[in-house]
Amino acid sequence: MTEMTKPFLIVIVGPTASGKTELSIEVAKKFNGEIISGDSMQVYQGMDIGTAKVTTEEMEGIPHYMIDILPPDASFSAYEFKKRAEKYIKDITRRGKVPIIAGGTGLYIQSLLYNYAFEDESISEDKMKQVKLKLKELEHLNNNKLHEYLASFDKESAKDIHPNNRKRVLRAIEYYLKTKKLLSSRKKVQQFTENYDTLLIGIEMSRETLYLRINKRVDIMLGHGLFNEVQHLVEQGFEASQSMQAIGYKELVPVIKGNISMENAVEKLKQHSRQYAKRQLTWFKNKMNVHWLNKERMSLQMMLDEITTQINKRSSNHDCKRKHPRPSTREL
């Protein structure tokens, strides 16, 4: 894929509770775009409040993709995200619209934007049964013990993945069980060639402001029925599913079981959310070339104006005969 034929897309990233949904919808309205969720948990049906899933009213008529596509007990990976998102980008671009990726799952977005060489992990049915049995055996381990198990055969991946990121730890273990190769070894040979002509926008603010927003959003989620949502998922038999290790769900299950108080669970939920936001910022700042917009200094309109400026500035540096032109902002 040459530079002149790369489709243009806008990517909006940032930590949890930073306002990605609101900005992405306004950008879509202004630039004739459609939105692809870049959140690893919003793919799951019935997990709405805890994942801060955009509502129909909030969409304001803007098409959204990669939301509510799987049951809570289904597995989902960066590879699967990449495959599906690529199809949506191709279709959106073909119809003359601008694909907009909005989300906070750094690995998923990075795998889409760059030429990740995912290996074929298909295995025989018997081998898959063995893998599932082993993963089932590991379910009872807490996060630290599971992380120690990963470190026993893949120290590099263990260093790169936080113990509380149970989903990524399990993914690294599953990869090894399937291929007998280390996930860390695969990453070393990745080719970071850009797949798209990307305007990568990030939302930032002071840590104090972000943490206040996170705490407030947790309170709002609880007020909107998060506990009932988690209880319903447990009653449906999804308690042991990988998706239930997401922040907002794993903290409330012990309350349902009568193991901890709601007060303690809420404090843990807020703490885990703040820690996750910190990890998100570290990922985006270290691994991606993001143009940051400060939410404390800029209004929503100022952000839109800056995005317009960036599009025009980038357009002036490219041949106007590109196959997939950026949206014109001359009449906006």
From Swiss-Prot:
It holds the Pfam family IPPT. Keywords: ATP-binding, Magnesium, Nucleotide-binding, Transferase, tRNA processing. Gene3D superfamilies: 1.10.20.140, P-loop containing nucleotide triphosphate hydrolases. InterPro entries: Dimethylallyltransferase, IPT, P-loop_NTPase. Residues 320-332 have a biased composition (Basic residues). GO terms for molecular function: ATP binding; tRNA dimethylallyltransferase activity. GO terms for biological process: tRNA modification. Substrate binds at T16, A17, S18, G19, K20, T21. The record marks T105 as: Interaction with substrate tRNA. The keyword tRNA processing applies. Residues 39-42, 167-171, 245-250, 278-285 are annotated as: Interaction with substrate tRNA. Signal peptide: none annotated. Residues 312-332 are annotated as: Disordered. Its EC number is 2.5.1.75. It catalyses: adenosine(37) in tRNA + dimethylallyl diphosphate = N(6)-dimethylallyladenosine(37) in tRNA + diphosphate. ATP binds at G14, P15, T16, A17, S18, G19, K20, T21. Its cofactor is Mg(2+). It is an enzyme of class 2 (transferase). Catalyzes the transfer of a dimethylallyl group onto the adenine at position 37 in tRNAs that read codons beginning with uridine, leading to the formation of N6-(dimethylallyl)adenosine (i(6)A). Monomer. Belongs to the IPP transferase family. This is tRNA dimethylallyltransferase. The gene is miaA.
